[in-house]
A protein has these predicted regions:
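Peripheral peptide segments
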Residues: 1-188
Length: 188
């Protein structure tokens, strides 16, 4: 994986996942607070990274974290965007659904555009979404931590990405620890 281009600057991390059929709020809310279920593991990883310190001195953050969610209704959005719940049956769960949302909302184009400034991009998405990301070449070489199917291990390695086999609902505790250590290493 590539080193940070600006070693003394804060480490910029982007975490990407997709929505869930579990809506935690009935009204308007941030996307971060709206989705539960399988998103919970990823939200815990985001919180862990966001609250970590570089050293014993807790005033020096380990990294600056941004969180993006690929939603069935709104496309790809930052997790702090305000959203309303939609029927759980409208949540993407098949290759056809993902392709339809891509046609309507171009989430791959938004991911490609917004991911360029980050030192590390952590991707925890379903297998078909990962295939779409790879096919579109939507993420930069040398900066991605891909939590995905073993089917993509070779392709991830060709792009100088860190491949982690998906464990658990989206991330898994062991993978979360590996990701945390990778971010700690690049932030030193």
């Amino acid at each position: 994986m590539m080193a940070k281009p600006y070693p003394n600057a804060p480490t910029l991390v982007l975490v990407i996942t997709n929505d869930s059929t579990v809506f935690l709020k009935k009204g308007v809310s941030s996307a971060f607070d709206m989705f539960g279920g399988r998103c919970t593991e990823v939200k815990k990883l985001v919180a862990r990274l966001d609250t970590a310190s570089k050293t014993e001195d807790t005033t020096k953050k380990l990294c600056e974290v941004s969180f993006g969610i690929i939603t069935s209704k709104y496309g790809y959005i930052p997790a702090d965007y305000t959203v309303m719940p939609y029927p759980p049956e409208e949540v993407m769960d098949s290759p056809e659904d993902y392709e339809a949302v891509q046609r309507k909302k171009d989430f791959l184009g938004k991911i490609d555009y917004t991911s360029k400034l980050f030192d590390r991009i952590i991707v925890c998405v379903p297998k078909h979404v990962m295939k779409m990301i790879l096919d579109a070449n939507a993420l930069p070489n040398g900066r991605v931590i891909a939590v995905t199917s073993p089917d993509f291990k070779e392709e991830c390695e060709k792009r100088d990405w860190l491949f982690l086999e998906r464990r658990g609902a989206r991330v898994g505790d062991a993978n979360a620890d590996i990701i945390f250590e990778e971010i700690r290493k690049i932030s030193e």
